[in-house]
C-alpha cells in the first residue's frame, strides 16, 4: 500500500479524552474514531490489526476442534426467560421491541441462543463432544465506558460453547480451550497467565481468566514468577490426546496465580518472597465450565450409551479481539508510539522514501516495494512529500516492526538503512541484502 493513497488520519496532539496509553495511541495513529460514548469506528489500519487478531483466533479454535458459526446480534427475550436470565441482567442489556411489539434484546452474550441451536439438532451422545464458536459484535450499556476499546459499549467477541455428555467430557473440553488460549495469546505476541477467577453472572464451578501484566491494568493480580518462564504448547500439540492436555493444564495451574477477587493470602504466603509477583493486569480471555446451568432449564439433552436422556454439560470460552488489540498496545509501546508484535502488525515493513521526486530514491523505493509485495511482506510505502522528521514520527507512531529508509546519500552508495522499531537498532545494507533479510522474515 502507498501512503499517498491510504486513509491514515494521524493526530498530532494527544486527545484530551484518552486516559490510557492504548486509547491515546489508537486515536493518534488513526486506528479508531469515537462515534459516541463507548462506540468506535475502526479505520483501515486499525481494522487490519483487528482482522489479523481474528485470523489467529480462528486458526487456534479450528486447531482445537471447534466449529465456527455466526449467530444474530438481536435475540428473542423468550430464550432469556427460559434460562431465567432476562430479569437477572440489569440495564447493561439493551432491550428493544420490534414493530409487532415483540420483546427483543441486543445480545451481550449467547449461551441461550447456542443452547437453542444445540437442542434443535443434537440427540445422541455419538454427536459429542461438540464445540461451536463465533466472532460477533456485542453491546453492553456500560455505566461509564472508558479507556477506549478496552471498556467500550460495543465490542467484538469470540464466544465458544462446548457440549459434552458428562463432567469428565466437559473438563476435557475446558482443557482443550485452556491450551488453545495459551497458544492464541502467544501467537499474538502476548504473555498471558491463566488465573483462578470468579465466574461472575454467567455462573459455574471452574473458571480462569487469562491476564497479561501491564502497568495500566484495571485488575490487581498475584502470581508466581515461574509463569514467566513456562514454555507455551507448540504447534505439534495433539488436541485429541487427553493425557497431553491434562499435563499442560497441570503445569500451567500448579504455580500460584489469582485475580484480586480470588486471592488467598494463606496460599500466597507459601510462595517464596523472591518469586512473588504482585502487579496490575489486563484480562484478555475468560473461560468457564458451568455444567447444566443452561441445559437444564432449556432442556438440552442427549441419549446416552445407557439409553437414557442426559442433560449436556457445557462450558463457555471468550476472547475479546477488539480489547486484545488495545491490550497488545498497553504491553508494547514507547514514548514514540506503538511497537507491534510481528504477527499482528498492520504492515510487515515501512519503506520511507526520504526524497520523493528524486530519481534514485524513487527507483530504489519502487524496487523494494515490488520485491517485498511479491514476497508477501505487505509493505507500506511512504511516498508522501513531507519533511523527514514527520515521516519518521509517523512510522514510529504506527509501530511497524521494520523501517527501510531510502535517502539520496544511501542510494548513491547502493545502500538503504534498516531500522528495528523495537530495539531502535539501525544497519546499512545493500539493497538486495535488505530485500533478502526482510523476505526471509516474512
Swiss-Prot record:
CDD domains: ProRS_anticodon_short, ProRS_core_prok. InterPro entries: aa-tRNA-synt_IIb (IPR002314), aa-tRNA-synth_II (IPR006195), aa-tRNA-synth_II/BPL/LPL (IPR045864), Anticodon-bd (IPR004154), Anticodon-bd_dom_sf (IPR036621), Pro-tRNA-ligase_IIa (IPR002316), Pro-tRNA-synth_IIa_bac-type (IPR004500), Pro-tRNA_synthetase (IPR050062). It catalyses: tRNA(Pro) + L-proline + ATP = L-prolyl-tRNA(Pro) + AMP + diphosphate. Keywords: Aminoacyl-tRNA synthetase, ATP-binding, Cytoplasm, Ligase, Nucleotide-binding, Protein biosynthesis. It comes from the Bacteria. One of its GO terms (biological process) is prolyl-tRNA aminoacylation. It holds the Pfam family HGTP_anticodon. GO terms for molecular function: ATP binding; proline-tRNA ligase activity. Disulfide bonds: none annotated. Gene3D superfamilies: Anticodon-binding domain (3.40.50.800), Bira Bifunctional Protein, Domain 2 (3.30.930.10). Its EC number is 6.1.1.15. GO terms for cellular component: cytosol. The keyword Ligase applies. Belongs to the class-II aminoacyl-tRNA synthetase family. ProS type 2 subfamily. Homodimer. Catalyzes the attachment of proline to tRNA(Pro) in a two-step reaction: proline is first activated by ATP to form Pro-AMP and then transferred to the acceptor end of tRNA(Pro). This is Proline--tRNA ligase. It comes from Brucella suis (strain ATCC 23445 / NCTC 10510).
Amino acid at each position: 500500500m502507498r501512503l499517498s493513497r491510504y486513509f491514515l488520519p494521524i493526530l498530532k496532539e494527544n486527545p484530551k479524552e484518552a486516559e490510557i496509553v492504548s486509547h491515546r495511541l489508537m486515536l493518534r495513529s488513526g486506528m479508531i474514531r469515537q462515534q459516541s460514548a463507548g462506540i468506535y469506528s475502526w479505520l483501515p489500519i486499525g481494522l487490519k490489526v483487528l482482522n489479523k487478531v481474528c485470523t489467529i483466533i480462528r486458526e487456534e479454535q479450528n486447531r482445537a476442534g471447534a466449529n465456527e458459526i455466526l449467530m444474530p446480534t438481536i435475540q428473542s427475550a423468550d430464550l432469556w426467560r427460559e434460562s431465567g436470565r432476562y430479569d437477572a441482567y440489569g440495564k447493561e442489556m439493551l432491550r428493544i421491541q420490534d414493530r409487532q411489539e415483540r420483546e427483543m434484546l441486543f445480545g451481550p452474550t449467547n449461551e441461550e441462543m447456542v443452547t437453542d441451536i444445540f437442542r434443535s439438532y443434537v440427540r445422541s451422545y455419538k454427536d459429542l463432544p461438540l464445540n461451536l464458536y463465533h466472532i460477533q459484535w456485542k453491546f453492553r450499556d456500560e455505566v461509564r465506558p472508558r479507556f477506549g476499546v478496552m471498556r467500550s459499549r460495543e465490542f467484538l467477541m469470540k464466544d465458544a460453547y462446548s457440549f459434552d455428555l458428562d463432567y469428565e467430557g466437559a473438563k476435557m473440553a475446558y482443557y482443550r480451550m485452556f491450551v488453545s488460549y495459551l497458544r492464541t495469546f502467544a501467537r499474538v505476541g502476548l504473555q498471558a497467565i491463566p488465573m483462578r477467577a470468579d465466574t461472575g453472572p454467567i455462573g459455574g464451578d471452574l473458571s480462569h481468566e487469562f491476564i497479561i501484566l501491564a502497568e495500566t491494568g484495571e485488575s490487581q493480580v498475584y502470581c508466581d514468577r515461574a509463569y514467566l518462564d513456562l514454555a507455551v504448547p507448540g504447534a505439534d500439540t495433539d488436541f485429541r490426546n487427553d493425557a497431553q492436555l491434562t499435563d499442560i493444564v497441570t503445569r500451567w495451574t500448579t504455580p500460584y496465580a489469582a485475580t484480586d477477587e480470588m486471592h488467598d493470602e494463606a496460599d500466597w504466603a507459601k510462595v517464596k518472597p523472591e518469586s512473588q509477583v504482585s502487579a496490575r493486569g489486563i484480562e484478555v480471555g475468560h473461560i468457564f465450565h458451568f455444567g447444566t446451568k443452561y441445559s437444564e432449564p432449556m432442556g438440552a439433552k442427549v441419549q446416552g450409551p445407557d439409553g437414557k436422556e442426559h442433560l449436556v454439560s457445557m462450558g463457555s470460552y471468550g476472547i475479546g479481539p477488539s480489547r486484545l488489540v488495545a491490550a497488545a498496545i498497553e504491553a508494547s509501546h514507547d514514548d514514540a508510539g506503538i511497537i507491534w508484535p510481528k504477527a499482528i502488525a498492520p504492515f510487515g515493513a515501512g519503506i520511507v522514501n526520504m526524497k520523493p521526486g528524486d530519481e534514485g530514491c524513487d527507483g530504489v523505493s519502487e524496487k523494494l516495494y515490488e520485491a517485498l509485495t511479491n514476497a508477501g511482506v505487505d509493505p507500506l510505502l511512504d511516498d508522501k512529500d513531507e519533511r523527514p522528521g514527520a515521516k519518521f514520527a509517523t512510522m514510529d507512531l504506527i509501530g511497524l516492526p521494520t523501517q527501510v529508509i531510502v535517502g539520496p546519500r544511501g542510494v548513491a552508495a547502493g545502500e538503504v538503512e534498516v531500522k528495528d522499531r523495537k530495539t531502535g537498532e539501525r544497519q546499512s545494507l545493500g539493497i538486495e541484502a535488505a530485500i533478502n533479510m526482510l523476505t526471509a522474515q516474512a
